[in-house]
């Protein structure tokens, strides 16, 4: 669902299915959501559809400036990767990498989500800065949001008693630094179900 028509028709399909079958915990999600018409943004919350996105592309890179904006025009370009608007409309967000098309590094993805500028191009102008997210919302999309859309929110995605200890420890507090430096953070420990699976100090990891 990259185009706004694809998004609208997908939302229409979910709405029709709910009318025919009644409500259920289906957790439908639309991936990519590069263009979402403003009229359709409130429908995500109304229908319980998750906005599943990969924020690394939400910046002024060649894919946007050379292959997208000249062809879709200024009207549609004004609602490209509208994460901020979707969040304000009450949509639940789930973020991922889209690897191998995009970087698998969530810290780089996070920096774009909060700045709309790529870490390797920090001097660039942001893409639609009003669509940037605060760090807490972006982190929740990568963690709790992704767990929710995969029906794993009872097991992982947040630090709560009884949930799996799936934890990444960084070398700095992301909330204590400039948002433009998020991607500079380094992982010092990764735990999966409480077991250490990565540390840069351990040979072979």
Question: What spans do the regions from the language model cover?
Answer:
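Extracellular/periplasmic ectodomains of large secreted or surface enzymes and adhesion receptors
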Residues: 200-205
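His/Asp/Glu-enriched, well-ordered alpha-helical/loop segment
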Residues: 1, 5-28, 32, 38-42, ...
